């Protein structure tokens, strides 16, 4: 008797990378922003008032999953608690500047763990890994830890976490950099934080954002 034919297993299709488009502010109504003092600035001075912000001045990847933070209209919660209470369509993470004194690979591993936590709790959310913003030339040239070459090295490692399908990388440094790749003097008063007049949330809107209708 002829041997029975064995059916080839059906391969799991790869997710199709979706197109990008610009959107209006309502797109961010189900967005969660996770970050440090720079994200605190977006929450306080930005125009995306319906978004949710898990942000604290000293937040970093080492405590992001355990630290309790005051979240508007929610209360003081840890990130896992927040992720279990609300459903988000997109999650933006800007962390790393406070951690620069640590090993960059270790920072990246902790960041990756944070991304995994978000993904497990919000399987349908789009995750945006955000580049850390540069510092001004006076700080970059004198600070052995908080300098732009080191920030660039960390950003390069964080960019590798994006897959272009469900996790994306956003770098807005070119909007604030001078010709030497430093934070422009006219954009910051402390060589670290951009002025409040630069609404970073509007920059998020102008960034190409994944089109959900495809």
Regions from the PLM with identified roles:
Residues 1-29:
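N-terminal, intrinsically disordered, polar/charged segments of Gram-positive cell-envelope systems
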């Amino acid at each position: 008797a002829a041997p029975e034919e064995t059916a080839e297993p059906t391969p799991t299709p790869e997710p199709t990378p979706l197109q990008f488009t610009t959107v209006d502010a309502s797109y961010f109504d189900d967005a969660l922003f996770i970050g440090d003092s720079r994200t605190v600035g977006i929450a306080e001075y930005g125009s995306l008032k319906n978004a949710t912000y898990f942000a604290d001045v000293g937040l970093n990847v080492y405590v992001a999953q355990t630290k309790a933070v005051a979240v508007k209209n929610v209360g003081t919660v840890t990130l896992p608690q927040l992720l279990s209470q609300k459903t988000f369509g997109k999650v933006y993470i800007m962390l790393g500047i406070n951690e620069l004194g640590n090993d960059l690979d270790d920072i990246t591993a902790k960041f990756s763990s944070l991304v995994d936590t978000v993904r497990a709790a919000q399987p349908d959310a789009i995750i945006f890994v955000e580049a850390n913003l540069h510092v001004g030339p006076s700080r970059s040239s004198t600070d052995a830890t908080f300098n732009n070459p080191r920030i660039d090295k960390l950003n390069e490692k964080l960019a590798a976490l994006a897959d272009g399908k469900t996790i994306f990388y956003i770098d807005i440094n070119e909007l604030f950099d001078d010709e030497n790749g430093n934070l422009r003097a006219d954009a910051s008063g402390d060589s670290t934080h951009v002025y409040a007049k630069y609404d970073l949330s509007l920059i998020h809107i102008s960034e190409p954002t994944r089109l959900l209708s495809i």
